[in-house]
Amino acid sequence: MLFRKMVVVLGILLAGSLQADGHMPDEAALLKKAEAFIDAFYSFESEKLAPLLEYANTSADSILYYQAWAEGGNYKVMNRGGCKFTDQGTVKCPITVEDDLVLALKTGFLVTDTFEITFVNSEIGKIETSSNDQPIYYEARDWVKANRPEIMQTVCNDMWKSVDKAGECVRAMHEGYKAYFDSIEKSGGA
């Protein structure tokens, strides 16, 4: 009986110390902040996203551009994976989307964009993005650059620099991707 009481008391003390040292609540708070970032990003409202990027000096502009690009490209979340810590201490949030550019290529593929968030002193310090775009996506982009230079010289001239032009740029790229698909379909390659 005494042993059982000691085990219960020890368990209570250990549980209390885990919460007192802040380890678990910090992880939970960071994951909550990462999920809030994803909510804000896909709200397509920059005024919700910008405050979360206050300390992300090196990536804030590109993330705000990407948000405007995603809105202009009609990104639709198809599967929202939960944000999770990596072995490197960052948080990864995989989001599978449907978007106009990929739809123009008629592959039936859904792209997963992954946001890797680095926290500094409990604030978002840096965000890197990656995706599993298929090779045809990059082939189409290169085709647009070569065959529709007016797109690259006008609305996409400041690509990834001018948030104000992001939506217009992605819509022009969408037209270019459709033209690319039509060209390979006509040549018997699709």
Task: Write out the residue ranges for each language-model feature.
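Short, well-ordered alpha-helical segments enriched in acidic and aromatic residues
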Residues: 40-59
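Short, low-complexity N-terminal intrinsically disordered segments enriched in polar/charged residues
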Residues: 18-43, 186-189
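Bacterial N-terminal signal peptides
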Residues: 8-15
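Low-complexity, intrinsically disordered terminal/linker segments enriched in charged
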Residues: 127-190
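Bacterial N-terminal signal peptides that target proteins for export
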Residues: 1-7
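A mature extracytoplasmic/lumenal domain signature
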Residues: 53, 95-99, 130-133
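Surface-exposed, charged secondary-structure patches
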Residues: 66-118
